[in-house]
From Swiss-Prot:
Gene Ontology terms: biological process: signal transduction
Family named by the database record: Belongs to the VAMP-associated protein (VAP) (TC 9.B.17) family.
Gene Ontology molecular functions: NAD+ nucleosidase activity, cyclic ADP-ribose generating
Organism: Arabidopsis thaliana (Mouse-ear cress)
Gene name tied to this protein: PVA14
Pfam families: Motile_Sperm, TIR
Record-linked PROSITE patterns: MSP, TIR
Name recorded for this polypeptide: Vesicle-associated protein 1-4
Keywords: Hydrolase, NAD, Repeat
């Protein structure tokens, strides 16, 4: 490869393992080692056989991007594994700030006199890797293991030798999706909804669609019940059981949960998934996994002893059937939050003027947010007598050090990510300061994704990513500053993310008496470990809090898994 190429590639050819009736894929890494914006376009000699995602794009200076080449499933093996197909990459220098959507075929036309660099790749068929056959301890090499799986995914019918565990057997199978755990366990608590989370992992190179259904649809529901798991990624599914009015006899349950999955076309989304895709009658074979539903005894937390009461006395607190937090639970939330937001100290600015201690710092971009979502949040906090800082309090034109002081004086920061957020270097500089305070244990940061797909945002896709790349180009002479921005974004994105819809908040805004309950839910998320300690909940116990009312037309589910809290907001 010559050193003056606009783009360099990590492969010199495209290799596909031949597996009949399965799509194959190969990823290419495109690296731009120049100081120019470089646009590219990919095309193949057989477009019906191969597709490239993305087929056009722009690689920023001194950066790289990944391209996935997908081959359609073969119905029969090619003779001698020979392939004459090729993949062509064309690339050229474009104007700074050019976006992916602005790349057109005309830009690469030689007839129009455009200088274009070309790279041609051969497509090669190779034999698929052969996994090693597992040999159980105590068996002769090559002998048949006594274990068998009669019902895929049914752990109770698998005999496992001493050296091969259930998880190992599942991992070594050729299933499209690996589901963890291997059964659905619900702790039995009368008059309470309970939930169980499942992790679906796709270790193939294909897009895999799934559909979930139960043998008792009135008793259980699954969120999401359909979806698409991208290649080499995973997703989480929540199974919820309706409240039981009486304990089942002998804790026995015959219900099952069925997952159907199949390979679909690249770029298929969840909204494209239909029941017909899994219909056997229509000739669409799907892989099926059945999970048993099991009832288990809930863990018994230690009995809390209130001051001034006898040990073992019955607690007064209870959770009402509608799922709202009980009076005792709300009191507990207040006991955690009040120390954070009471007894506010004051500070003095550079001109000797006494200012209130700002306890919540709101980091956002754009007047459209100030007049809608941010306005709601500020009102909700002020109703709770919490001091809030937004830039409407400060004089415009103040330097960043002044804003940094406001962050240092705050206990909680709310970072509201919108499409326009990454237009502002000030927002990102504030975020860097928030990250520093967070790492020192002085600040709790709550990220909110405002009308954004959280996953796309974390991958810097769409307008959010385009704006960031434009800002990187504008400040390309300050690489250390850019690196701090990216580190701050990644750090904050690893926290909980709430997905916001302004229409819902407008409804709440008309009835501000309901906002304090919602506010407590938002702020308490990052203190959940403290609640667990107070209530005796363990990390293996799934705690479900449902908030429902006529005003709020969606449920908020909160449950910790390995010290993480996941929030699902949906109609």
């Amino acid at each position: 490869m010559s050193t003056d190429e606009l783009l360099t590639f990590d492969h010199v050819d495209i290799r596909f393992p031949i597996e009949l009736n399965k799509q194959g894929s190969c990823s290419l890494n495109l690296t731009n080692k120049t100081d120019n914006y470089v646009a590219f376009k990919a095309q193949t000699t057989k477009p019906k056989m191969y597709c490239v995602k993305p087929s056009v794009g722009v690689v920023l200076p001194r950066s790289s991007c990944e391209v996935l080449v997908v081959m359609q499933a073969l119905k029969e093996a090619p003779a001698d594994r020979q392939c004459k197909d090729k993949l062509l990459f064309q690339c050229k220098v474009v104007e700074p700030g050019t976006m992916d959507k602005e790349v057109t075929s005309e830009m690469f036309s030689k007839e129009a006199g455009h200088r274009v660099e070309e790279t041609i790749f051969k497509i090669i068929y190779v034999a698929p890797p052969q996994p090693q056959s597992p040999v159980q301890e105590g068996l002769e090499d090559g002998s048949s293991p006594s274990a068998s799986v009669s019902d895929k995914g049914n752990a109770s019918e698998v005999f496992v030798g001493p050296s091969v565990g259930i998880v190992d057997l599942i991992r070594m199978s050729d299933e499209l999706l690996i589901i963890d755990p291997v059964d659905v366990q619900f702790p039995i608590e009368l008059n309470k909804k309970v939930s169980c989370s499942l992790n679906l992992t796709n270790k193939t190179e294909n897009y895999v669609a799934f559909k979930a259904k139960t043998t008792n649809a009135k008793k259980y529901y699954v969120r999401p019940n359909v979806g698409v798991v991208l290649p080499r990624s995973s997703c989480e599914v929540l199974v919820i059981m309706q409240a039981l009015k009486e304990a089942p006899a002998d804790m026995q349950c015959r219900d099952k949960l069925l997952f159907q999955c199949k390979v679909v076309e690249p770029e298929t989304t969840a909204k494209d998934v239909t029941s017909e895709m899994f219909s056997k009658e229509a000739g669409h074979p799907a892989e099926e996994t059945r999970l048993k539903v099991m009832y288990v005894t809930p863990p018994q937390p230690p009995s809390p002893v209130q001051e001034g009461t006898e040990e073992g006395s019955s607690p007064r607190a209870s959770v009402s059937d509608n799922g709202n937090a009980s009076e005792a639970f709300v009191d507990m939330l207040r006991s955690l939050l009040v120390p954070l937001f009471s007894n506010a100290a004051s500070s003095t600015d550079d001109h000797g003027i006494t200012l209130p201690q700002y306890q919540v710092f709101i980091n956002f971009r754009g007047d459209e947010l100030r007049n809608s979502f941010v306005g709601f949040l500020v009102k909700a906090m002020r109703l709770e007598k919490i001091n809030v800082f937004t830039d409407e309090v400060e004089l415009r034109g103040t330097n960043l050090n002044y804003l940094f002081r406001r962050i240092e004086e705050s206990r909680v920061a709310v970072a509201i990510f919108s499409e326009r957020y990454t237009e502002s270097c000030w927002c990102l500089d504030e975020l860097v300061k928030m990250k520093e305070q967070m790492e020192q244990g002085k600040l709790v940061v709550v990220p909110v994704f405002y009308r954004l797909n959280a996953t796309a945002c974390k991958r810097f896709m769409g307008a959010f990513g385009d704006n960031l790349r434009n800002l990187e180009w504008e400040y390309r002479s300050e690489p250390e500053r850019i690196q701090k921005w990216k580190e701050a974004l990644s750090s904050v994105f690893s926290n909980i993310g709430l997905t916001s819809d302004i229409r819902r908040y407008n409804l709440i805004n008309k009835n501000m008496d309901h906002t304090s309950e919602f506010l407590y839910i938002v702020l308490i998320l990052n203190f959940f470990s403290e609640i667990s300690d107070m209530t005796g909940l363990t990390t293996s116990y799934q705690f479900l809090l449902m908030m429902k009312s006529n005003l709020i037309s969606y449920d908020i589910y909160i449950y910790p898994t390995k010290f993480c809290v996941n929030v699902f907001i949906g109609v």
